[in-house]
Regions:
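Short, basic (Lys/Arg/His-rich) helix/loop patches that form interaction surfaces
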Residues: 96, 152, 168-172, 194-236
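Short, polar N-cap/turn motifs at the start of nucleic acid-interacting alpha helices
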Residues: 129-134, 208, 229-248
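C-terminal secondary-structure termini that scaffold catalytic or DNA-interacting sites
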Residues: 181-184, 263-268
Length: 268
């Protein structure tokens, strides 16, 4: 789909298969990686698909050489997972802005920040997945990254905002974020979160490019650890496979010396 959109956006869109050459692919990959501000991994995923397509064209005689040859993947060792934490002052600005401009997008931000639910998983949440009495949110295995059901604790701010937005007045089988971020029967991809963040939040609040919608998840984990919530609780809420993953988020400025080791004494 992005390839079709990119081609349509060109001053002279390609029409014939011979125009699908290495120069065109290079420019498309740069568009995905640089202009759309995607990760190196996303860039590699697109290139991998293009390699398969190029192989198909060669196999069936549409071209006389594999046009992706010479375009390399970015090595995994060169891909560093960037975790950008949004500052407290910017979190306040974000909250104040969305309270007046778009409470439903603020709700999506709260779910990402407090429940650590990935954007794609958020897009599949239905009204009936919330258990207000128990204070939990159910994520179904069909849509989670590890393909397991998950029951997460809901922060009171999420419930209060859902009531304020009238979310619980909709049928339980409605998606929480359908067209226009309003509950509805139609599934909408997580792209609408990224688009709103890029075109409205980042633009109007003048956030740096390093601030992405997904940054709220990393910021939420770090904020909980900074608030001295124990690592086990944070690990379970974030669904980390190991406490070692959670420890990566621990801010260095709150790490404290172990008093037992400080006072440890021997004959040496």
């Amino acid at each position: 789909r992005n390839l079709v959109r990119y081609t349509a956006s060109l001053k002279v869109p390609i029409t014939y298969i011979y125009q699908f050459n290495r120069e065109y692919i290079n420019e498309f990959i740069e568009h995905i990686y640089i202009e759309r501000e995607n990760s190196a991994q996303t860039r590699n995923n697109y290139l991998s698909w293009l390699r398969i397509f190029a192989g198909y064209l060669l196999k069936h005689g549409y071209v006389d050489k594999k046009v992706t040859d010479g375009i390399d993947l970015i090595p995994k060792r060169s891909i560093k997972k960037q975790r950008t934490v949004i500052s407290e002052s910017d979190l306040i600005r974000l909250q104040e802005y969305l309270k007046t401009k778009n409470k439903r997008f603020l709700l999506a931000c709260y779910i990402l920040f407090y429940c650590f639910v990935r954007p794609k998983e958020i897009s599949y949440i239905r009204i009936g997945d919330f258990n207000v009495k128990a204070g939990t949110l159910l994520l179904h295995s069909d849509y989670t990254k590890n393909h397991k059901d998950a029951v997460l604790t809901i922060n009171r701010k999420i419930i209060e905002l859902m009531i304020d937005c009238g979310s619980f007045s909709y049928p339980s089988d409605y998606y929480l974020f359908s067209d226009g971020l309003t509950p509805g029967p139609k599934w909408r991809s997580e792209k609408q979160f990224r688009d709103y963040w890029t075109h409205y939040v980042r633009k109007n609040l003048r956030f740096p490019v390093s601030y992405k919608f997904y940054s709220l998840k990393d910021t939420g984990v770090t904020s909980m650890l900074r608030a001295r919530i124990d690592n086990i609780s944070v690990r379970d809420q974030a669904r980390h496979s190991s406490i070692l993953i959670t420890d990566i988020y621990t801010p260095h400025d709150i790490e404290q010396a172990n008093p037992i080791i400080q006072k440890f004494d021997t004959v040496f």
